Design a protein with these regions (language model features):
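Flavin-dependent oxidoreductase catalytic cores
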Residues: 1-125
Length: 125
């Protein structure tokens, strides 16, 4: 469940400092509204970077699945790290929109501000 405002992309992909959608799980409140009208599974999205928060939303039945874009750009190994008990090593998306949305808008592809840091760590290993 998300929103789309094609005249202002920052409302569709909000940064952490967005006045209305700056908090984790920023679109989840709409999932509860939609739940009143359907029994179909609802997928939540929007600032889902904390595994414990996501798990609680699933457990509470607010969502039946979680979608992540920027978070998986920030740490493509998110799922594997959780599976291997390495949640504290997850790079959490800070929702800066610098390289992901910024790169997309500049036609430079989608990357993440963490890419350089991860590349340095890989070279050290």
């Amino acid at each position: 469940m998300t929103l789309a405002n094609h005249s202002a992309l920052e409302n569709t992909i909000p940064p952490a400092n967005h006045p209305y959608f700056g908090h984790p799980g920023c679109f989840l409140k709409f999932c509860n509204e939609v739940r009143q009208y359907t029994d179909l599974p609802i997928c939540g999205v929007g600032g889902l970077n904390d595994p414990d928060f996501v798990e609680q939303q699933l457990f509470d039945g607010h969502i039946q699945c979680a979608a992540m874009s920027r978070q998986l750009l920030a740490d493509p190994d998110w799922v594997n790290k959780l599976k291997n008990g390495q949640a504290k090593q997850i790079y959490r998306c800070v929702r800066c929109n610098k390289k992901c949305l910024g790169g997309l808008m500049a036609h430079q592809g989608t990357r993440c501000a963490y890419d350089a840091l991860r590349e340095k760590e890989t070279q050290k290993a």
